[in-house]
């Protein structure tokens, strides 16, 4: 028993090393737990650093037991109580360096700048294409105010999600995600309802992606066909005059048309055949099935994850495109609260809930924010970094939304012509818009399998306990998800409508209801629940419910 209390490192050497433990220039401050004698060399011509026989014996036992079974077998892994404390363990590299392990929870990987950028990059999605349309639906002044207020509200709710794990006493929640917190407070209902709303957000995103990919593939193919065959096509729609052409595809309706309207100059028969086989809603959504259905069946999405940088490149290019177009077109604004005008919209419109639905999804990161912040090097900065990230996201949305809305040439075009995907306001022959569509198309084709993988993990993993139970199960799920996307792209290609419905639905649970309820329950259990807190958080829940209900009346 006395031998168990023997220090692993000779006390005199340990105390001497401890004095210089934080001195980066002292090589002894990076001493590994154990080094084989053949690796021990003199340091600055001093005597070699010797390790006790107890440490040497323990090292040999750990190596011995690790070879008795398969590495995947957990039965013979050394238990925690026989290992040194985390602060005494070093990872020794054959390259000659030793890395100190600060803790066993794996935190402390990324700086604040990296964390902020990760959150910004994760939140920047397809919603940015519909922000100008949402501002048009709400009115310019009202839309900008709603953007600001929704950013603050969703940030507060996200803050409550981050703090939710800390409200659980006497339990190690270091590896918990927000659905685990929901299960703790609401039981199996919390678990399955969080799964349901998470699937709503994922499948909604996949539907939007399918509609947009059909749109981008159609316009890309049309541009290439016209260029290769030297076809001179002018869009037979309302447009402005000038080199930076802006069009109004649907002057009398906010619903996208199922066919393009062009006047062509060339071989009419060939062009008519091309239009028959290359239709935005009748054929192109089905062509995507051949491209994407096999990709959804991959067991691992690691290959597609390598292309995540394309999302950042696409957003930067979109912002640059909007800046360039706005500089050339100039601003066209006229403020009016009540007067109905031919080319402008009122500053306040009753259809503003369409923007709140879009923004709920645009600011939605609540189901994965805990995971993103786990790797923050300084956990004390989580709230600050989250706030900065939300500020940058909000500024990006406001910049794109205001620039597109304000620079839309009115007159001769009405602001009502702003499309749910603002790239549709640029003709297929626009080279800058063509490059943007190419970027977004390729980026979405790499992200779509990742979304499908997440759906598979959450649905099949919960039902069967295996994310790949069989080829038949995976294929059936993929066909169902792809089928929904094809149907929506064929009969309801309105990304603004899809985004606002899915955003209001998943946001009801993850943004408005669960964070507020969990906070009130935790305060009640500690005897700290006050009337003003009840009023604030009940109001947030009511706003979430009203946001969802209002989408059905727009």
From Swiss-Prot:
Pfam families according to UniProt: Aa_trans
Modification note: Glycosylated.
Important for arginine binding and amino acid transport as annotated region, ranges: 122-127
Residues binding arginine: 127
Listed PANTHER family: AMINO ACID TRANSPORTER (PTHR22950), NEUTRAL AMINO ACID TRANSPORTER 9 (PTHR22950:SF244)
Subunit structure: Associated component of the Ragulator complex. Associated component of the Rag GTPases heterodimers.
UniProt protein name: Neutral amino acid transporter 9
Taxonomic source organism: Xenopus tropicalis
């Amino acid at each position: 028993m006395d031998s168990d209390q023997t220090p692993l490192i000779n006390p005199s050497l340990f105390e001497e090393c401890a004095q210089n433990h934080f001195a980066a220039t002292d090589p002894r401050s990076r001493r590994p737990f154990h080094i084989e004698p053949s690796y021990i060399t003199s340091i600055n011509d001093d005597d070699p650093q010797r390790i006790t026989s107890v440490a040497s014996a323990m090292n040999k036992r750990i190596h011995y037991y690790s070879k008795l079974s398969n590495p995947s077998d957990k039965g013979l892994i050394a238990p925690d109580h026989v290992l040194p404390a985390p602060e005494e363990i070093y990872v020794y590299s054959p390259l000659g360096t030793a890395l100190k392990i600060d803790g066993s929870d794996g935190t402390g990987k990324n700086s604040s700048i990296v964390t902020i950028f990760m959150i910004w990059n994760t939140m920047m999605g397809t919603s940015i294409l519909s922000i100008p349309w949402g501002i048009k639906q709400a009115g310019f002044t009202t839309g900008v105010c709603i953007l600001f207020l929704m950013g603050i509200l969703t940030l507060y709710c996200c803050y409550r999600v981050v703090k939710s794990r800390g409200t659980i006493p006497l339990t190690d929640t270091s590896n918990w995600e927000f659905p685990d917190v929901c299960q703790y407070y609401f039981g199996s209902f919390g678990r399955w309802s969080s799964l349901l709303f998470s699937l709503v957000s994922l499948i909604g995103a996949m539907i939007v992606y399918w509609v947009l990919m059909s749109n981008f593939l159609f316009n890309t193919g049309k541009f290439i066909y016209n260029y290769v065959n030297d076809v001179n096509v002018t869009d037979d729609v309302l447009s402005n005059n000038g080199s930076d052409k802006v069009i109004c595809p649907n002057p009398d309706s906010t619903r996208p048309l199922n066919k393009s309207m062009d006047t062509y100059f060339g071989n009419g028969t060939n062009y008519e055949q091309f239009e028959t086989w290359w239709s935005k809603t009748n054929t192109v959504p089905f062509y995507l099935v051949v491209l994407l259905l096999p990709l959804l069946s991959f067991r691992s999405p690691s290959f597609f994850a390598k292309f995540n940088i394309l999302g950042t490149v696409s957003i930067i290019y979109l912002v640059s495109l909007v800046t360039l177009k706005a500089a050339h077109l100039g601003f066209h604004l006229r403020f009016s609260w009540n007067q109905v005008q031919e080319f402008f919209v009122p500053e306040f419109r009753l259809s503003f809930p369409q923007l709140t639905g879009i923004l709920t999804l645009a600011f939605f990161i609540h189901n994965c924010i805990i995971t993103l912040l786990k790797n923050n090097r300084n956990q004390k900065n989580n709230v600050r970094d989250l706030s900065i990230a939300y500020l940058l996201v909000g500024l990006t949305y406001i910049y794109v939304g205001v620039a597109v809305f304000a620079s839309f040439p009115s007159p001769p075009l009405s602001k009502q012509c702003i499309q749910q995907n603002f790239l549709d306001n640029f003709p297929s022959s626009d080279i800058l818009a063509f490059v943007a569509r190419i970027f977004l198309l390729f980026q979405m084709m790499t992200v779509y399998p990742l979304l499908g993988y997440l759906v598979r993990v959450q649905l099949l993993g919960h039902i069967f306990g295996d994310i790949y139970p069989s080829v038949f199960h995976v294929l059936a799920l993929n066909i169902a998800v792809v089928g929904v996307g094809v149907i929506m792209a064929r009969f309801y290609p309105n990304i603004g409508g899809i985004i606002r419905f899915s955003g209001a639905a998943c946001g009801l649970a993850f943004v408005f209801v669960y964070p507020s309820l969990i906070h009130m329950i935790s305060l009640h259990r500690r005897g700290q629940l006050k009337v003003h807190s009840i009023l604030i958080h009940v109001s947030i829940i009511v706003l979430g419910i009203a946001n969802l209900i209002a989408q059905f009346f727009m």
